[in-house]
A protein has these predicted regions:
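Glycine-rich loop(s) and the adjacent beta-strand/alpha-helix scaffold that form part
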Residues: 169-217, 234, 238
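Residue-level recognition of phosphate/Mg2+-coordinating polar/acidic sites
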Residues: 45, 66-68, 76, 85, ...
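A conserved beta-strand/loop element that lines the FAD pocket in flavoprotein oxidoreductases
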Residues: 129-142, 202
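Glycine-rich FAD pyrophosphate-binding loop
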Residues: 9, 25-55
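A conserved short coil-to-beta-strand element within the FAD-binding core of flavoproteins
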Residues: 138-153
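Beta1/beta-strand and adjacent pyrophosphate-binding region of the FAD-binding site
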Residues: 2-16
Length: 451
């Protein structure tokens, strides 16, 4: 049984953990170069979840200023402010540039590696941490953490391979529950709870929301699922899902109605996938939808297919088109349903028409404008942790000092990244949250060792 002593141990070699390692090692290098910083990562390689971010392209940050950035952070963006100003989005780009990775900025202020390879981000993060002096150890699955307040090395970390590590400071950067195959299995929540911290309710966010009848299943019971309303992504699509799957709607409006009240409205792109409603605005709306479904509320998604046109103008346009179709000799003698389909081809994408007709059986040329402006779909469930982008909820931020990320309950214990009750919208926000909180936690732990 091997035993290794360190000054700072970081559990988790993801975005937050690698930045915590760099922040700690860089801070220690000037005043305490002999100090030892160790990252314990249970997977064979670090940064596994980063590798699948943005479908492998890795939208690693967003260049919006704090006022705009904070609007995309939940539930209390103010908690992030000290971390963000310590390591802003611009500073993060400079950090990666110094590590040899060039970046490009695309629509919506989203930053990507110029190569469009997530592996370049991981290589830069690992390289920077190791260059600063941190040691990144993989295949180290932690099974127990203990702490003794009266000991100099107050934290003892035991791994499944029998190795034991002791340290003066401990930073937990274990991520959430999303994409468990990447190593995010919620271990940090258990350890935090064992050490006296409370955990805010966990639920999937940035995930597909599933309209009624979309999947050939009913929602699973609590006993069979991590959350009520979860729908297995692998279940076959029902007829509705099969007809809608693959359609990508550009520049549409989406409103979410919860128990009869409009909870949120967005404009942008919406995708129908094998999971349900996704795409930028689908993902952004999912946080409120999932939370509402878990609490037993009725959720309805309302799609505005023509958000740039007022309903009165759309009615006039459709009436004009209908009259033109009626006067056309080629369609004048056709059945009503055939003429109506001709009308639909002029206002909807061709591939969407079969599903639209199926889901709106009572629509006709007189009511079409109203239906296009408010295509309603009741939401019955959501795709769970196996495919959601981020976990909402986590270690209670009221029990963490925002200026240092140190526990208010246990000295020398720090938290960073997805494990804490802080999450963002799609668009590079979540990785920046991880980078900023990780770096500040590492710096703070190191400063306590120096001063």
């Amino acid at each position: 049984m091997s035993k290794t002593s360190a000054d700072i141990i970081i559990i988790g070699g993801g975005a937050a953990g690698l930045m915590a390692a760099a922040g700690a090692a860089r801070t220690l290098s000037a005043k305490k170069p002999e100090a030892k910083v160790i990252v314990l990562e249970k997977m064979p390689r670090p940064g596994r979840k980063i590798m699948i971010t943005g479908k492998g392209r890795c939208n690693f940050t967003n260049l919006k200023n704090w006022n705009e950035f904070s609007e995309h952070v939940h539930p209390k963006p103010g908690f992030l402010k000290p971390s963000f100003y310590n390591l802003t989005s611009e500073k993060m780009i400079d950090y990666l540039t110094d590590a040899g990775m060039e970046s490009v900025v695309e629509r919506g202020d989203r930053a990507f590696p110029a190569s469009h390879l997530a592996s370049d981000v991981v290589d830069a993060l690992v390289g920077s941490a190791e260059y600063a002096g941190a040691e990144v150890l993989c295949g180290k699955e932690v099974n127990k953490i203990s702490h003794a307040e009266d000991a100099e090395e107050r934290y003892t970390v035991a791994c499944n391979d029998g190795s034991i590590y002791t340290s003066r400071k401990l930073i937990i950067c274990t991520g959430g529950l999303s994409y468990p195959k990447t190593g995010s299995t919620g271990d940090g929540y258990r350890w935090a709870k064992e050490m006296g911290h409370s955990i805010k309710a966990l639920f999937p966010s940035l995930t597909a929301i599933v309209p009624s009848g979309y999947k050939d299943v009913t929602p699973l019971s609590k006993e069979k699922s991590v959350v009520k309303g979860h729908i297995d992504r692998s279940t076959p699509l029902a007829e509705t899902g099969s007809m809608l799957c693959g359609n990508q709607l550009k520049n549409v409006g989406l409103s979410i109605v919860i128990d009869g009240n409009i909870a949120d409205e967005e404009f942008g792109d919406l995708d129908f996938t094998d999971g349900g409603l996704e795409g930028p605005i689908g993902f952004k709306m999912s946080r409120k939808c999932v939370n509402a479904l878990i609490n037993g509320s009725k959720v309805v998604a309302v799609i505005d297919m023509k958000p740039a046109v007022e309903i009165e103008d759309l009615q006039v346009r459709i009436a004009t088109l209908w009259n033109e179709i009626a006067k056309d000799k080629r369609s004048a003698n056709k059945l009503y349903k055939d003429r109506f389909r001709i009308l639909l081809t002029k206002v909807l994408p061709m591939q969407l028409i079969p599903a639209f007709v199926k889901l709106n059986p009572n629509a006709d040329h007189k009511t079409l404008a109203k239906t296009l402006k408010a295509w309603k779909m009741e939401i019955e469930g959501f795709v769970g942790y196996e495919r959601c982008v981020v976990t909402a909820g986590g270690v209670n931020i009221e029990e963490i000092t925002p200026k240092t990320l140190e526990s208010r309950l246990i000295p020398g214990l720090y938290f960073a990244g997805e494990v804490i009750d802080l999450d963002g919208d799609t668009g590079g926000y979540n990785l920046q949250i991880a980078f900023s909180t990780g770096y500040l936690a590492g710096m703070s732990a190191a400063r306590q060792l120096i001063y």
